[in-house]
């Protein structure tokens, strides 16, 4: 059976990572969390106090402490920078609020996209992000673009933060998500937009299982036809 490449794009908190992980597990595919890679680069910048003018230093740190993914005993995915487990650190609000400017740096995107394409070559992979279908994997057999209202996405992020023990204010989250949408869709390098051949799916009011079922059915149909 042919193993395909699946690209899932969409704005912040549209449910990309959640459904991508479930589908990867169901299909026996590899899940590559591209967002975690950009968050890791952002974590480096914030930890060292680097600005956009010091991109060479961020890249140097990435080379010294490469990003890797490992599985925890419970099957969840852990993110490492070198030997440091940054799984929780890269989900903190300061990283979330700064990832847009770091991910907009051409040199950072070039390096991480190169790594992502190399990993995806063999197929049987599912990636989620903001430019997977348009830039990273333009040859992906299945491209999905998930959308949802700002209100719904803020609610998801609020619940997610509660589960992780991260304090947050709902109204502030709404403002941050709206601001992130604007930054991501107006940046010069790889702006957030659906690929021309992507299936656009509004997840507002749709359960996780409903989104998973929709994408899996599309994937299985492509595999059956190949």
UniProtKB/Swiss-Prot annotation:
Localization terms from the record: Cytoplasm
Disulfide bridge partners, by residue number: none
Main localization of the protein described in the UniProt heading: cytoplasm
Enzyme class: transferase
Any GO molecular function: ATP binding
Catalytic activity: CMP + ATP = CDP + ADP; dCMP + ATP = dCDP + ADP
Protein keywords: ATP-binding, Cytoplasm, Kinase, Nucleotide-binding, Transferase
GO annotation terms (biological process): nucleobase-containing small molecule interconversion; pyrimidine nucleotide metabolic process
Claim: Kinase is one of the keywords in the record: yes
Protein family membership: Belongs to the cytidylate kinase family. Type 1 subfamily.
HAMAP family referenced in this protein's UniProt entry, alphabetically: Cytidyl_kinase_type1
Name recorded for this polypeptide: Cytidylate kinase
């Amino acid at each position: 059976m042919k193993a395909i490449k699946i690209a899932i794009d969409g704005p912040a908190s549209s449910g990309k990572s959640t459904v991508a992980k479930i589908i990867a597990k169901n299909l026996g595919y590899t899940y590559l969390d591209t967002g975690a890679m950009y968050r890791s680069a952002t974590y480096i910048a914030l930890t060292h106090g680097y600005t956009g003018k010091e991109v060479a230093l961020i890249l140097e740190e990435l080379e010294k402490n490469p990003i890797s993914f490992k599985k925890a005993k419970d099957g969840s995915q852990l993110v490492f920078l070198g030997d440091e487990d940054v799984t929780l650190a890269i989900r903190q609000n300061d990283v979330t609020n700064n990832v847009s400017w770091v991910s907009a740096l051409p040199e950072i995107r070039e390096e991480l996209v190169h790594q992502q394409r190399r990993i995806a070559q063999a197929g049987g992979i599912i990636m989620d992000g903001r430019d997977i279908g348009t830039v990273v994997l333009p040859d992906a057999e299945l491209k999905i673009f998930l959308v949802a209202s700002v209100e719904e996405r803020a609610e998801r992020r609020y619940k997610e933060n509660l589960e992780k023990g991260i304090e947050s204010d709902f109204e502030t989250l709404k403002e941050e998500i709206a601001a992130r949408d604007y930054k991501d869709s107006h940046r010069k390098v790889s702006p957030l937009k659906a690929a021309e051949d992507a299936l656009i799916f509004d997840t507002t009011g749709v359960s996780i299982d409903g989104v998973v079922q929709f994408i899996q059915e599309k994937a299985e149909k492509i595999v059956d036809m190949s």
